[in-house]
Amino acid sequence: MKKLLLIINLFLLPLSNLVQAQFCSQDNRFTEIEYFSLQDVDSVSNVVYGSAIDYQGTTTTLKLDIYFPDQNVDLFNLRPLVLMIHGGGFIAGNKEDRKTECIALAQKGYVAATISYRLGWNTGLQRIQAIYRAHQDANASLRYLVSNYSTYGIDTNWIFIGGTSAGAITANNVNYTSQNEWNILFPGIETMLGSLDTSGNTYTNSFDLKGIFNNWGAVPINSMQSSEMIPQIAFHGELDQIVNIDTATSLIGSRSIHYALLSNNICADITIDSVGQHGIFTDRAGAIFRASKASCFFRSIFCNDCQDVYTTDSIPANCSSTVSINEPSVPNKISAYPNPVQEALTVQGIPNNTNVSIYNSVGDLKRIEKYMNAIYFSDLEQGLYFVKFENSAVGINYVLKVLKE
């Protein structure tokens, strides 16, 4: 791989929420690392979260599978939840399709659930009804999980949602498309199919999403309001002919979502396969790759150090490489000045002849050198850079965030 993306935990900012600080712990939980072995992951299959009438008028039992660290092994009582929704064009697919991502996330310390939902439609605009029913069922599953948080050890303050294709569209709808917006776009739909917040079960719990794991999905045009925007990590093929990566007739694709978030100062991370079509990184290794990236992205939200990323390279997740310094070998405090910098950056606490690698904000390696009293930025464009110092002789593995003016 030509690029190494260094989006890692650079600074642990003061946190007012004790649980958030716990999730931002110095160990490898919620990183790309398999913190728990496969044997330490428990699961419960075919949990009934509700029932509802499908497009044929038949009552359908709605089920989910849930994966979580063994509560006899994990010291945490409550964990973040990631809800996954399968794809299939609202006519095919099943909850087992997202099993690999759920297991991978559970091994990293999350509670992960994958749901079944009502599929199918007859003709024409009834496809819109299928999309609406999927939204209803996703809401019902979240109400169920919030109501039963203690059973599965869920921290209801930290809920993330994701999916693939139709499932990613549904995940985005849950956050961005309100009942009022549905009613305006398709008058009478609530009267015909019921509301988003009462269909499927009688739970009345509310939920607050903290981020979205969007895999080749989209959101209806005009649904994204700045007040609703939350961090999103996305994966999409440049050549996708089914769900356009940009803006199509009625949908905003992943890249357009990415730019909309950035324009509103909301953290966003997107990986684009420049020759990819509909569905990228879809084999088992690819699913784990995406889940690992999502895990690190969510961790960055816990740690208040989320970074914007746009890449066309398959850069593996790497958030377990936090600052590591051998205290007896180097000073306790490393500092750099001036930062922001225009010309020369002086770094105290780093000995000469330490290896230096400079990356821009999207992971392009700009320069490799030895540290000798200063680092010169005069030949680099304005912007954010990550400067990595490595010196095995004294135990230094340190990353510094630098702004070039």
What are the roles of these predicted feature ranges?
Residues I128-S150:
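Alpha/beta-hydrolase active-site loop
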Residues E96-T114:
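Short amphipathic alpha-helix adjacent to the substrate-entry channel of hydrolases
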Residues P328-E405:
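C-terminal outer-membrane/trafficking sorting elements
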Residues F23-F76:
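N-terminal cap/lid segment of alpha/beta-hydrolase-fold proteins
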